[in-house]
């Protein structure tokens, strides 16, 4: 079960660590009653990277079709760190990491340190 207080607490721990430049969390981005990661994360974001969720859903649609609309994958900026929130399935994590996060992470971190 996804607990919003635990999610926000773990994110706050990452933000408090000066060595942390990016936070990646997974799971809880669906639409069931227990899925509350999106709400917890969205309330913390100072800037949203809407393109992440949009492109993630597009790529997911290419792989699995219409169930892609149920994903609430998101990304944004919190206190100068980039945060990615992905669905919990192995395939979704692999897709996000290989196609979006790893190819762009260095550029995002560089932009945030300007």
Q: What is the predicted role of each segment?
A:
Residues 1-114:
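Non-catalytic beta/alpha edge segments that cap or flank active sites
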